[in-house]
A protein has these predicted regions:
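Active-site beta-loop-alpha junctions enriched in small/polar residues
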Residues: 8-12, 45-46, 73-77, 102-104, ...
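Active-site gating/metal-coordination segments in enzymes
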Residues: 39, 47-124, 170, 174
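Hydrophobic faces of well-ordered beta-strands that scaffold small-molecule active sites
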Residues: 3-7, 40-42, 70-72, 97-101, ...
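Mobile, glycine- and charge-enriched loop segments
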Residues: 1-18, 58-62, 66-73
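Catalytic pocket-lining loop regions of alpha/beta-barrel enzymes
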Residues: 105-200, 246, 253-254, 279
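Alpha-helical elements of Rossmann-like donor-binding domains used by nucleotide-donor carbohydrate transfer enzymes
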Residues: 27, 56-59, 86-89, 111, ...
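Mid-to-C-terminal alpha-helical segments outside catalytic/metal-binding sites
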Residues: 1-5, 9, 21-39, 198, ...
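Alpha-helical scaffolding within the catalytic cores
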Residues: 23-28, 51-60, 84-85, 131-135, ...
């Protein structure tokens, strides 16, 4: 199985570029089918109200009948004070299996990390080249898995990408994806130093061709076992923990796969940031 772990979808409302205007999937799906990609993780386009954008992605997930996974997009500043409830709805009602945060909106916060900890979700955080935050995240939230896309920099900041490789090597909960990584030598170095267990295949579709991005993985010349980890195994391992919450002792398993009970009384004690817990 091949899973593209990084593809945007739906409409934005910013009109400053494709990333916040529209991310149509028609051509992407054709390209993905031709490339042999089986499933895709959808992320909303940039939006001033992610509740709208996430709802559009959730609808696509339902209509796809299992073709799409989804990561709920969180705006660290606009959603402040309500993030626990947003994530609760995203997991329980909409079927999301991870959280997406972009530094373009605002820097990641404890509130986001605490929600990820409770629901055992991976966090895809685009640091836009400022990879030093990985050190703090690894220290403060060693039990939360973070995926830093683009090997740390979509803008090809080679210094940032080299620094991220160091974080991948040193921190068990730090991962990256291959979306838009143009320095193939650095991608090779990431696999060699950090190992194939820390890398996820992603395309940054629908704007980048998923077949072209996938070919980079094949060109790494890995064993079938290591290639499988990058193409699907690592992602499936990272989202498997969502089911552990679903099967927690005091929760009732939902009838819909991938969703967890609406009874969160047993989880609330895990939400450790006392500055925000009182609001829920």
């Amino acid at each position: 199985m091949i899973i593209d772990c990084h593809c945007h979808a739906g409409h934005g409302d910013g009109f400053t570029g494709p990333w916040d205007t529209n991310a149509p999937l028609k051509r992407y799906l054709k390209w993905a089918e031709e490339a042999g990609i089986d499933r895709t993780v959808l992320l909303a386009a940039f939006h001033s109200d992610y509740s709208v954008a996430n709802a559009e992605v959730a609808k696509m997930m339902v209509q796809s009948r299992g073709r799409f996974y989804g990561f709920v997009f969180i705006h660290a500043r606009h959603d402040q004070g309500n993030i626990f409830n947003i994530v609760k709805k995203a997991v329980n009602q909409q079927g999301f299996v991870g959280i997406k945060v972009h530094q373009h909106d605002a820097r990641i916060t404890r509130e986001i990390c605490e929600a990820a900890r409770v629901f055992k979700l991976p966090v895809l955080y685009d640091v836009t080249g400022e990879v030093s935050i990985c050190e703090l995240l690894a220290q403060e939230y060693p039990d939360v898995n973070f995926i830093i896309p683009h090997l740390g920099s979509f803008a090809d900041d080679w210094k940032a990408q080299l620094a991220l490789i160091d974080h991948l090597v040193r921190h068990p909960n730090m991962y990256t994806d291959t979306a838009g990584v143009r320095r193939f030598d650095l991608l090779e170095q990431a696999v060699q130093r950090a190992g194939p267990d820390k890398i996820l295949f992603g395309s940054d579709g629908p704007w980048l061709h998923p077949g072209v991005e996938l070919e980079k993985i094949f060109l790494l010349g890995l064993s079938a076992q290591d290639e499988k980890k990058i193409l699907s195994g690592n992602f499936l391992r990272l989202i498997k923990s969502v089911n552990q919450v679903q099967r927690s002792k005091n929760s009732v398993i939902s009838k819909k796969p991938g969703m967890i009970s609406s009874d969160y009384s047993s989880l609330r004690h895990e939400y450790r940031d006392r500055r925000v817990i009182g609001r829920y």
